[in-house]
């Protein structure tokens, strides 16, 4: 069972994301003084008075025909449906607007606890203005200045008072994974296809998913996953909007939070130079990796198409030789059912521990096949090896002189270890260290 859920809703530019970030304690939602900059539901976990809960930020709702508005309304309705408590944010500076009344009518139908937060009450003189908001018929208004942190404690007190009694601890066996890739490779459509729900705004306009969005789901075997959809990354020279700049930073954070990363390629466009750069971020972070070629249904194929693609990927992503490749279609759901098992297998590989005795047998067998190198008449001696970490599996090899361990021989030892043990989808690190 998930944690209790709080949805933050309201019209555009009333400070929902600022309040969300104040409660979450970090800058998760993109906040700018531009209407409509938060378009999707954004999730975070918060706690207050020893109660832990999830909070959802939503795009601004308005009764107008603005771009994306129907999708934003639909997303907000899903968020309200998921929520145990709803925080309705209005602006004390502007008073009640037609859009506020439109949102209030939506909230009447939910029959859920509503906390009315009157934001932008930045000084004591403005407190008298909040009484007008009783006219919305949603109970006592709470004066708040989310920018300055004034009144947020009262809102949190009210949230906790209305939470359901059950509180469930997080699952320590949860596997976290993210989808990374350039804009418009189909990451959001993949999420929607996997979940069977319009979880994020999926649009053919590149870059329509701006934030990293967490979604929890369980497979048929009871394994829980947290899926993080990241904003598409773009070359620095092509990032013009501040929001895009924030999104690249957030994508890096999403990779950092992940156990496994799905590197999504677009079959229609082929492999781009920047795809390799993006994948390099995950590789350097030591994450498990699956290379996902999306939009496979759009290609005209023959008996060699898949093999040709695999060969090209192996050539272009030489540093990802350990990463499995899967060809999928978010539209037709082709092969998507295989992804959870692949992610689980990679997670197991990341957490594999090899007993030192078994590891050293493999190392000695490797030396018998290919003796250690020499340099200026001095031979590399390997005394023993031991595993020192997981996620990724990391091994220290104790030697007589670190300088004698050539990169090529270290790669040879890595290949022998991979042959002996299952490390599919995860990098492994080998470190040569002089024995003292």
UniProtKB/Swiss-Prot annotation:
Gene3D superfamilies: 3.30.300.20, P-loop containing nucleotide triphosphate hydrolases. Residues 4-167, 175-351 form the EngA-type G domain. Residues 352-436 form the KH-like domain. GTP 2 binds at residues 181-188, 229-233, 294-297. This is GTPase Der. GTP 1 binds at residues 10-17, 57-61, 119-122. SUPFAM superfamilies: P-loop containing nucleoside triphosphate hydrolases. The keyword GTP-binding applies.
């Amino acid at each position: 069972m998930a944690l209790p859920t709080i949805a933050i809703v309201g019209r555009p530019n009333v400070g929902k994301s600022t309040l969300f970030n104040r409660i979450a304690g970090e800058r998760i939602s993109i906040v700018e003084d531009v209407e409509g900059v938060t378009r999707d539901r954004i999730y975070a976990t918060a706690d207050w008075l020893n109660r832990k809960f999830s909070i959802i930020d939503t795009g601004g709702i308005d009764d107008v025909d603005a771009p994306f508005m129907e999708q934003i309304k639909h997303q907000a309705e899903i968020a309200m449906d998921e929520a145990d408590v709803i925080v309705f944010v209005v602006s004390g500076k502007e008073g009640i607007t037609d859009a506020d009344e439109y949102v209030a009518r939506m909230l009447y139908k939910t029959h859920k606890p509503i906390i009315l937060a009157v934001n932008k009450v930045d000084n004591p003189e403005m407190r008298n203005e909040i009484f007008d908001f009783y006219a919305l018929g949603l109970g006592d208004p709470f004066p708040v200045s989310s920018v300055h942190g004034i009144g947020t404690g009262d809102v949190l007190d009210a949230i906790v008072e209305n939470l359901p009694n059950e509180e469930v601890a997080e699952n320590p066996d949860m596997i976290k994974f993210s989808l990374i890739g350039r804009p418009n490779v189909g990451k959001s459509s993949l999420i929607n296809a996997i979940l069977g729900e319009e979880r994020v705004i999926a649009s053919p306009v590149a870059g329509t998913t701006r934030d990293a969005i967490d979604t929890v789901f369980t497979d048929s075997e009871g394994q829980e996953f947290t899926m993080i959809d990241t904003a598409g990354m773009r070359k620095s020279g092509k990032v013009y909007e501040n929001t895009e700049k924030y999104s690249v930073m957030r994508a890096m954070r999403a990779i950092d939070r992940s156990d496994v990363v799905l590197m999504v390629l677009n079959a229609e466009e082929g492999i781009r130079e920047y795809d390799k750069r993006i994948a390099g971020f995950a590789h350097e972070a030591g994450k498990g990796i699956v290379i996902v070629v999306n939009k496979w249904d759009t290609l005209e194929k023959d008996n060699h198409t898949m093999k040709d693609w695999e060969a090209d990927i192996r050539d272009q992503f030489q540093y990802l030789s350990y990463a499995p490749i899967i060809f999928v279609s978010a539209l037709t759901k082709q092969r998507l059912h295989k992804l959870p098992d692949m992610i689980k297998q990679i997670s197991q590989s990341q957490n594999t521990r090899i007993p030192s005795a078994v590891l050293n047998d493999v190392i000695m067998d490797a030396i018998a096949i290919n003796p250690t190198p020499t340099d200026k008449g001095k031979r590399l001696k390997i005394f023993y090896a031991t595993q020192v970490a997981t996620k990724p599996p990391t091994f220290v090899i104790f030697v007589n002189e670190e300088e004698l361990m050539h990169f090529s021989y270290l790669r040879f030892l890595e290949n022998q270890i991979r042959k002996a043990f299952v490390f599919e989808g995860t990098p492994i690190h080998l470190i040569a260290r002089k024995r003292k």
